[in-house]
Amino acid sequence: MIPVFLAAIAVFLPLTSGHIAFWHNSMYGFNVTEQTFPYDNRPVVPLQNMTFKEWWFHNHLDYPPHPGDFFELPAGKPAMAELACNKGATTWFNSSEGGNIQNGDDPCPGSPPSEYHTTGFDDLKGCALAIAYEPDVTKIKPEDFTIFSVNQTCVWYRFTDFQVPERMPSCPPGGCHCAWFWIHSPDSGGEQIYMNGFKCKITGSTSNVPLAKPKVARRCGADPDHGKPDAVPGNCTYGAKQPLYWLQQEGNNEFDDYIAPPFYNDLYNFKDGAQNDIFIDSYPHGIPDPSPEQTIIPTPLDAAVISNATPAPSNGSCSSRPPSSPVSSSAASTTTSRSPRPSARGFRRSTGEKAHTGLPRKSWTQSRKMRYVF
C-alpha cells in the first residue's frame, strides 16, 4: 500500500521544467510567460540559432522592470542571485504561474541535474555576470558588456554568490545594465547560450576608475577532452573581457564548434570570483597581443597598491573588507537560508549519483557526430 500511496502523491507534486534563468524583479521579461510570445520565450528558454533581436536580452526589451527596481551589487562583497528552472522555486514565487515550489537551495525542485544540463558537480562549467555603464538599454551593444564576476559552480545552487570587484565605480544616474550568461557542458543536452538582462547598480563604491574596453575572450586553458592537456597562457585574453556570444545566426564573437563550446571558466581565462583586472589601470605596462607563441604573460598591478593611489568619490565610502556572510540582493523575504560557501569547489549537494569512475571521456568525434554550421 505504501508504494501505491507514494506514487499517488507524486502525481500531484509540482515539477519544474528544465533549463535555468536568473530571477529578480529588476530583470527584463520578469513576467513573461509561455503565452506572451508566438513562441516559447520564457526567461528559462535557451538561445540557439536565433537572430540578433531574438537572442539579445532574450527579446525582452519590451518587457522592462518597474522604474526603481535594481539588482544591487555591493563593491568588494558577494551579491546573491537566485538561479532556478521556474520562478516558483525562488523568493519571487508570488508572481509565478504555479505558486510556491521552493525547496531550499535546489535550483530545479523535482528534477534531476540533467534538467539543468549537468551530469554532476564535476561537470559544471560556470556562469557569469556582465555590466554596461549605460542607463539607456537601447544604446547598449554586445561589445559594451564586461564580465565582472564568475561563479564556476554554476548551475548547482539556487542561491549563487557573485563576488563583486572592490574597485567597481558607481553607476551613472539612472543606473547600469547587467546580464547573466551561462553555457553548459556538452555532456548533458544540446548546446545553447543563456542570457537574462536586468537593471543594476553598484553600492558602496570607493573608486572612480572606469573599466577598460572589453576584448573578446580566447580559448587558452587546458582542454584534455580535445587533445590539449596543457594550458597556453600566452593565448589568453587578459583584463576586461566580453561575454561569450555563440551559436546564433548573427552577433557571435565566438565561433567554436558545436561540440567544443566556450565556457566561463579557466578555459577562457575567466577565473572564479571577482574579475579584479578589468580596470583601465590594471595593467600599467600594457598587455601583449595574445597568440599561441606569446611568451610574455602580463601581470596586473596589485589591487592594494592601486587602491591606495585611487581617490574615493566624495559621495560616500565603504569598507573594503568583505563580510563574513553574503549580502542578499533580493528585496523579497525568503523562508529558506543557507550558510556562505566558496563559489567553486564548495559543498556538494547529494544527488544519489554514482561516484565518478575516473574513466576517460570519449573524444568529441566518438561522443558526437553533430557539427554546427554557422
Swiss-Prot record:
Its EC number is 1.14.99.-. Keywords: Copper, Disulfide bond, Glycoprotein, Metal-binding, Monooxygenase, Oxidoreductase, Secreted, Signal. Residues 306-374 are annotated as: Disordered. Lytic polysaccharide monooxygenase (LPMO) that oxidatively cleaves xylan with both C1 and C4 regioselectivity and that specifically targets the protective shield made by heteroxylans that cover cellulose microfibrils in wood. Catalysis by LPMOs requires the reduction of the active-site copper from Cu(II) to Cu(I) by a reducing agent and H(2)O(2) or O(2) as a cosubstrate. Cleavage occurs only when xylans are bound to cellulose and not when they are in solution. InterPro entries: LPMO_AA14. Pfam families: LPMO_AA14. It is found in: Secreted. Glycans are attached at residues 31, 49, 94, 151, 235, 315. One of its GO terms (molecular function) is monooxygenase activity. The gene is AA14B. The unique enzyme activity of AA14 family LPMOs involved in the degradation of woody biomass in nature offers an innovative solution for improving enzyme cocktails for biorefinery applications. Its main location: secreted. Residues 313-344 have a biased composition (Low complexity). GO terms for cellular component: extracellular region. Residues 1-18 form the signal peptide. Its cofactor is Cu(2+). This is AA14 family lytic polysaccharide monooxygenase B. Belongs to the polysaccharide monooxygenase AA14 family. It comes from the Eukaryota. Disulfide bonds join 85-108, 127-154, 171-176, 178-200, 220-236. Binds 1 copper ion per subunit.
